[in-house]
From Swiss-Prot:
Probably functions as a manganese efflux pump. The chain crosses the membrane at residues 6-26, 37-57, 59-79, 104-126, 131-149, 164-181. This is Putative manganese efflux pump MntP. Its main location: membrane.
């Protein structure tokens, strides 16, 4: 695979990370949160192709069957929770919304946004493609896209107010639904 093809694959895989990062950035955008989400999304996007490559093509059917459902469930849960919490915090302005850049929410988001990368790893294994360099490109690209998306989400939130938090949660729900339909 050429460098251009590798970069295009990395950009395509980073789109989910970008969308989720923008949704999270509407509420959570201090430097530590940006680092945590960008680092973990990049790390998971890098490690999932490696895991997929090692597991091999025998389980490719399983991932292609259940991967979208797993991602759907994780994104629906976290997006719904974000939207619900933002409605609650709009009603009680002192309400605290849980930080999705920490703990189990961070791991679930990282897994959900990197399931496609697992499938790419299977493909690389089947085709005998160079894995390490491609995985590094994929991880770096996802991390950078997440960083930019969180900054953009935060800027939109400052311009349009607290309702952008609800939009952020609904973006995650929309991505979850898209995974099942397309």
């Amino acid at each position: 695979m050429s460098v251009v093809e590798t970069v295009l694959v990395a950009l395509a895989l980073g789109c989910d990370a970008f969308a989720v990062g923008m949704g999270v950035g509407t509420r959570f955008c201090n430097p530590r949160q940006i680092f945590r989400l960008s680092f973990h999304f990049g790390l998971f996007q890098m490690m999932m192709p490696i895991a997929g490559w090692f597991v091999g093509s025998r389980a490719a059917d399983l991932v292609s069957t259940w991967g979208p459902w797993i991602s759907f469930a994780l994104l629906l849960f976290i997006g719904g929770k974000m939207a619900y919490e933002s409605f609650r915090s709009l009603e009680a302005e002192d309400g605290e919304c849980p930080d999705p850049t920490k703990g189990s929410s961070l791991v679930m988001l990282s897994v959900a946004t990197s399931m496609d990368a697992l499938g790419v790893g299977f493909s690389f294994g089947i085709l005998g493609q160079q894995l390490f360099l491609s995985a590094v490109w994929i991880g770096i690209t996802a991390g950078i896209m997440t960083w930019g998306a969180m900054r953009l989400g935060n800027r939109l939130s400052r311009q349009f107010g607290r309702r952008m938090e609800t939009v952020g949660g609904l973006i995650l729900v929309a991505i979850a639904v898209k995974l099942l339909l397309f």
